[in-house]
Design a protein with these regions (language model features):
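Sensory modules in modular signal-transduction proteins
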Residues: 3-29, 35
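Signal-transducing coiled-coil linker helices
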Residues: 12-15, 59-97, 104-116, 166-167
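Sensory-domain cores of signal-transduction modules, predominantly PAS/LOV
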Residues: 19-20, 27, 124, 216-218, ...
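PAS/LOV sensory domain surfaces, especially short acidic/polar patches at coil-to-helix junctions
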Residues: 27-38, 132, 238
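Conserved long alpha-helical elements within nucleotide-processing catalytic cores of c-di-GMP signaling
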Residues: 90, 100-126, 133-163, 169-173, ...
Length: 248
């Protein structure tokens, strides 16, 4: 077989290679590429990054190997499934499985971010703890399934009380936390607290029954009530406890 035939067969093999593969000369000229690579290159320029998202939404990992003659082989591997698995794993690690809200781990991180932003902009951060005082009774009377339904409904109602920039998290079994960012006036926090009270006031319908929940709310403000997230949560919890005692 002549060298010309060998080269033709090699080009044909590369052209039909199932993955995105390209062979480059040492002076940067494209020698041959697979159809998969050609389709990617036609849709958008190939990125020099090790990993990137293509025009069609796929995540690609780019690897390059040097050839003895100074050229190189470039391979693009589709890692979309791996990326989705990583994203799902991160979501599980940072979110409550029942309500889909941020969990305590993510709440702590969001608080740190909110405080850093407030320090740069000379603003306040409000932390509200909402405790469902008689949730244990719901659980004991109606069972776990009904209790879960109530918690999901509480989460939906509270979601309507915050802005996109704010955070609503499930801080404990029967407790939710709201982080309200970038406040100019402490009065804005009272507005949010009133929204929460109004959101939880209507009856909950579960399994053909109706019930009302009593909730106690505690509020703390950065920087007046604490300089970090842990201090703000402690202060809000103390305020919540005082509010509950006063109501009795």
């Amino acid at each position: 077989m002549s060298k010309a035939d060998e080269l033709r067969l090699l080009r044909e093999a590369i052209k039909n290679f199932p993955d995105a593969l390209a062979v480059w000369s040492r002076d940067g000229q494209l020698v041959a590429c697979s159809d998969a690579y050609a389709r990617l290159a036609a849709a958008a320029p190939i990125s020099e990054a090790a990993e990137y998202q293509s025009a069609d939404g796929r995540w690609l990992r780019r690897s390059v190997r040097a050839l003895d003659d100074g050229g190189r082989i470039e391979l693009l591997a589709d890692i979309s499934d791996l990326r989705r698995a990583e994203q799902a794993s991160r979501f599980v690690a940072y979110h409550d499985s029942l309500t889909g809200l941020p969990n305590r781990r993510l709440l702590d991180d969001r608080l740190r971010q909110a405080i850093r932003l407030a320090q740069r902009r000379d603003r306040m951060v409000a932390t509200l703890l909402v405790h469902l005082d008689d949730f244990g009774r719901v659980n004991d009377t109606l069972g776990d399934g009904a209790a879960d339904t109530v918690l999901r409904e509480v989460a939906e109602r509270l979601t309507r009380c915050v802005r996109k920039a704010d955070t609503l998290a499930r801080a404990a079994v029967d407790e939710f936390a709201l982080v309200v960012c970038d406040l100019k006036d402490a009065a804005d926090c009272r507005v949010v607290a009133e929204k929460v009270t109004q959101a939880l006031a209507p009856e909950f319908r579960v399994g053909g029954r109706t019930l009302r929940l009593k909730a106690s709310i505690g509020v703390s403000l950065f920087p007046a009530d604490g300089g970090d997230g842990e201090a703000l949560l402690r202060s809000a919890d103390a305020a919540r406890y005082r509010a509950r005692q006063l109501r009795r």
